Regions:
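ATP/nucleoside-binding phosphotransfer catalytic cores, i.e., glycine-rich phosphate-binding loops
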Residues: 188, 216-224, 231-304
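Gly/Ser/Thr-rich active-site loops/lids in small-molecule metabolic enzymes
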Residues: 154-165, 206-235
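Catalytic core of DAGKc-family lipid kinases
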Residues: 9, 19, 40, 78-83, ...
Length: 304
């Protein structure tokens, strides 16, 4: 691929965004490429900008934001010949980390320029949840409920939520789910259906980050392979402190006798008789009675 026209999509309310850094990035990119810059105004705007970029013949869309905006760009560009690249400006930057991109956005820009000038790009496989692509993770149950709780507290952007609030919300949900009957049923590939309280499907390890520490929910996951699935069959009240420590304190893999783990799956089906929350790449996908998760192989051009 040859990269000449670039669109830089900027989320000005992303957690680590700064105007000074943006100015440096713009200057660096415009020295080698025909650059256009657009700021997002609201949720969903990044997707609209990327769709228009495809129609306009832009070669590469660069997103300077966090994982939520990355997800919008991913969904707009998958299946097209327009490539994407990501520069870190979010709270966790899971996608950027998984690609081995530096967390310093200026350093990451230098890497991007070098690869784009050498026409280096690769095809990335994506997870698909009911027709919605995801780059890093998808969840049904506890983690989706946590994301919904944050969306309710911070409807404009999660950039302003603090780590204490996140941990408090997660703890509240763990305690609330403890002792509950498993009301989900999960079937992984051709396996038998299993009862579940919460299902987490990861494409990366770590699954997410907290205070810079990786939360290793899907420790064998890789962007080069399929779907890794962790399912919690039961959450005993006496197990809540141990699991909370595994999640927030130890950076070790979440494990236990009531936890099922499958590596490199191709299909996950989650069903329930009552609606359950779903999240993709940290944003709520609403309530579902049935969720089918699969893998779309090599559908997105990526420079990174």
């Amino acid at each position: 691929m040859r990269f000449q026209r670039l669109l830089l999509v900027v989320n000005p309310v992303a957690r680590t965004f700064s105007k000074g850094t943006l100015a440096v990035i713009e200057k660096a990119l415009s020295a080698d490429f025909r650059l256009e810059v657009a700021e997002t105004k609201e949720r969903g705007h990044a997707s609209e900008l990327a769709v228009q970029a495809v129609d306009d013949g832009v070669d590469l869309v660069v997103v300077f934001s966090g994982d939520g905006t990355v997800n919008e760009i991913v969904n707009a560009l998958a299946g097209t010949e327009t490539a994407m690249a990501a520069l870190p400006a979010g709270a966790t930057n899971i996608f950027v980390r998984a690609l081995g991109i530096p967390l310093d956005p200026v350093e990451a820009t230098g890497m991007l320029i070098a690869k784009a000038l050498d026409d280096e790009a690769f095809k990335l496989s994506l997870g698909v949840a009911d027709g919605h692509y995801f780059a890093v993770n998808c969840g049904a149950g506890v983690d989706a409920a946590a994301m919904r709780r944050l969306d309710e507290k911070f409807p404009t952007t999660k950039a302003r939520f603090d780590r204490v609030a996140f941990r408090a919300a997660a703890w509240e949900l763990l305690v609330g789910y403890a002792g509950r009957r498993a009301d989900l049923e999960v079937r992984i590939d051709d396996g038998e259906p299993l009862p579940s309280l919460s299902v987490m499907v990861g494409r990366t390890d770590p699954y997410t980050y907290y205070k810079g520490r990786g939360l290793r929910v899907t420790p064998d996951a890789s962007l080069d392979e399929g779907l890794d699935v962790l399912s919690v069959r039961k959450l005993r009240r006496r197990s809540v402190p141990r699991i909370a420590w595994q999640v927030f304190g130890s950076a070790r893999h979440v494990h236990g006798r009531d936890i099922d783990y499958v590596h490199d799956a191709s299909r996950v089906l989650v069903t329930s008789s009552t609606p359950f929350p779903v999240q993709v790449d940290g944003d709520s996908l609403g309530d579902h009675l049935r969720l089918e998760v699969g893998l779309a192989r090599e559908v997105l051009w990526v420079v990174g």
